[in-house]
């Protein structure tokens, strides 16, 4: 009987050696928000607690400066 292999989650920021997550890096931040604009939890993405806090802060700053939307476009 074949077993399902689940890939181990890991923190991409820790693996790449990122010191701090920048709120101006919209391409990276978009990977961590849903279509509706919610921040994806770390249990889904595998991000460590330290970087999840930085990520949430960066997304909130980008939203405040209108770099990212708060919600979807409602179309």
Swiss-Prot record:
GO molecular function: small ribosomal subunit rRNA binding; structural constituent of ribosome
Alphabetical keyword list: Ribonucleoprotein, Ribosomal protein, RNA-binding, rRNA-binding
GO-annotated cellular components: cytosolic small ribosomal subunit
SUPFAM superfamilies assigned: Ribosomal protein S18
Tagged with keyword Iron: no
Gene3D superfamilies in alphabetical order: Ribosomal protein S18 (4.10.640.10)
GO biological process: translation
Pfam families assigned to the protein according to its UniProt record, in alphabetical order: Ribosomal_S18 (PF01084)
InterPro entries per the UniProt record, alphabetical: Ribosomal_bS18, Ribosomal_bS18_CS, Ribosomal_bS18_sf
Entry function: Binds as a heterodimer with protein bS6 to the central domain of the 16S rRNA, where it helps stabilize the platform of the 30S subunit.
Subunit and interaction comment: Part of the 30S ribosomal subunit. Forms a tight heterodimer with protein bS6.
PANTHER family per record: 30S RIBOSOMAL PROTEIN S18, SMALL RIBOSOMAL SUBUNIT PROTEIN BS18M
Annotated family: Belongs to the bacterial ribosomal protein bS18 family.
Record's protein name: Small ribosomal subunit protein bS18
């Amino acid at each position: 009987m074949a077993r399902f292999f689940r890939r181990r989650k890991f923190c991409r920021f820790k693996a790449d050696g990122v010191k701090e997550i920048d709120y101006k890096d919209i391409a990276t931040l978009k990977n961590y928000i849903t279509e509706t604009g919610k921040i994806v939890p770390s249990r889904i993405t595998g991000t460590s607690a330290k970087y999840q806090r930085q990520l949430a802060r960066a997304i909130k700053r980008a939203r405040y400066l209108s770099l990212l939307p708060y919600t979807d476009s409602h179309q």
